[in-house]
Amino acid sequence: MRRHHTIAIQALALSLTALSVTALEAQVNWDVVRRSTESHLRPILSPRTPLAKWIGQSSTFCYHSLDSQGKRTYYIVNAATGQRELLLPSPSQFVRAFRTFSGDTTLQEEQLELSSLNFEGGQTRFFSFRGAGKKYYRYDRKTGQFASIDKPATSFDEQKPARTKALHPRYTVYGKGYNLYLKDSTTGELRQMTHEGEEAMSFTTQASADTLSTTPRGEWWGDVYLVELQDTRGVGDMTLVNPLSKPRPRAKTFRMPMPFDKHQPQTRLYRYDARTGQGGMVEEVNHFDGGSVSLQLRPDEGEVLFTRRSRLADTLQLCRLDVATGKSQVLITEAIHPHINLTLTGYRLLRNGQIIWWSERTGYGAYYLYDRNGKELRQLTSGHELVAAHIVHIDERAGTLTFAAYGGGTGNPYYRKYYQVGLNGKGQRCLTPDEADHELELAPSGEVGLLTTSRMDLPPRYSTLALKGRSGAHLFDSIPRSMLEAAGWQAPELVRVLSADGRTPLYGVLYRPAVIDSTKRYPLISNVYPGPQTDLVPRSFALDDNGNQSLANMGCYVLNVAARGSSPFRGRDFYCYSVGQLRDYPLADDKTAIEQIAKTHPIDLDRIGIYGHSGGGFQTMAAMCTYPDFYKVGFAASGNHDNNIYINWWGEVFHGSPKIPTTIELAPRLRGKLMLTVGGMDNNVPPASTYRLAQALIKAGKPFEFFLFPDARHDLESPYYTGLLRRFFGEHLLHLSAEDLQHISYK
């Protein structure tokens, strides 16, 4: 016991080491730092962001906007034409008339807010809203007349009801404990349907309940009842201890498969025939040992489509299950080396039974059309280095497919654009050609949408976009750049560099100090996240993303560049670059990017820092130890430092072989200043990864700082976390004065 106490005291002493800074005068303009933060700028941006309230099934929507004085104005927009009109041409007249009619004085012209705004019958002439005392009123925009009404059946403040499960006219299914029971309303008989249920494989959604009210999982297909359930039997446990639980610390244990464990979670399908009383697992669903299954149940078709994926994700099959017989048929098999695209892979079904299937067989993702039996008919989408992404809309009557895509051979390949192509594979065209990122929100009709166009250096522009015809986008509103700049916003620099191979272009964002002294050279901090499932480089407009602009205004440059292997949107080879080198693949690219930036900006290459969260924390530690003479200060948060004890599919797919290299092995090579921080209740990346790294550093005699958020989970984002990061870099990399360090807030 004494040895463990010694280790704990040693780690605590490291975290409480007194600050050693030169007594200099304050050198940071903290007002500039404050004015560049998201919390300062968000109240200026948010009121100008349209939230479309679509009117029925029409192509018209309503939204409101606030000016700098907080005055709210309501508009109606015809998305087919882009034409915008005022909902209330004279708000003052509207308010006076309403007060006269209702006696309700709570409605104010200066801060006009129409609660529960609702347009009746999908028309714009009449709308209803809620006044004081939960009273509702209807207003006729044509006559200017008010009427008192009951609460409208629907409003914009209410969500659509969830789909209810199909009921059987004769049989009712109940759950008790982990199993299911069937009651025959004709005979009154109650019989047990399943017997295999247990805590790790429950047929009900309330596994701990022991009453008949427990909710069953399945649905009826005629007289056949199908149940999809998770089988976690044999899967190993992960335990966390919450030290803040009262009156005693409490252990939280959950099942968590690790890479190359024998037992993995399995999706199973149970089939029960009420006519015969026979039931059992449909074993054909689980063809791949340790793989995964995704079911798409289609009660209207009397069949079940499902995909099953091999454990290493190098094979994906689309299958059809005949519900009546329980037999399955393989329709499409996709075999990709080293693994499929886990983000974009998918399919859609047409009403005639044809299948739209996504494939990366050419190296770049595209959609293909198959008949209902799995015969390929044609490739639908195409383009040089174009990666087709999610499907936005399928108009089977018009024979068109609208989809998002990335790349295409020109410009920044990370910008999302929208395309349309015929289901005959012809006539593909780009609907949003601007060199910017786009986000499209479709109307319920699927014929028009609200389009947001932006970049990190371009505040949002709002347009309407019609999916039919060639009218293009119609601008109806935007965020004035001058308004944001006056409030303290600074446009970052969009950068393009080459990877360590000297050929592959990499893209990112460079945040600069508000004031640059031409006689000085500045430290640079690299904000990293390696992927592979995504990178965290912002493409659309964001305010002080990750706090990087306000950090830069403390007196440094901050760089965020996506390395090879960091994104599923640039083709198979780029995406799969991590395989076999999960620890090391992004390191050389990040170092090379910094060196290139230093050739065109006043960067002090002797003062390079690095930080990241999750995979970024993992990369931070690996970079600090791989290039110890280059990265001098690192801040690693919630890092998956040992991927051998992380979630199973991460290491199996993205690395591909057992014994995944860890940052723990690199601990003896640490020379710079390092902060490790983690949440004690992290149920995503087990904190054991960080604890094991800390122990390795202690054994290697390496000084470091360690901070534990006792009850935090994976996301550590908080004012205290931000203050901790700023203090660490301010002290060790920027060498700020004691007075400056005292300005850093932790709340």
PLM ranges: what are they?
Residues 10-20:
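Bacterial N-terminal signal peptides
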Residues 15-17, 379, 530, 707:
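Compositionally biased, intrinsically disordered low-complexity regions
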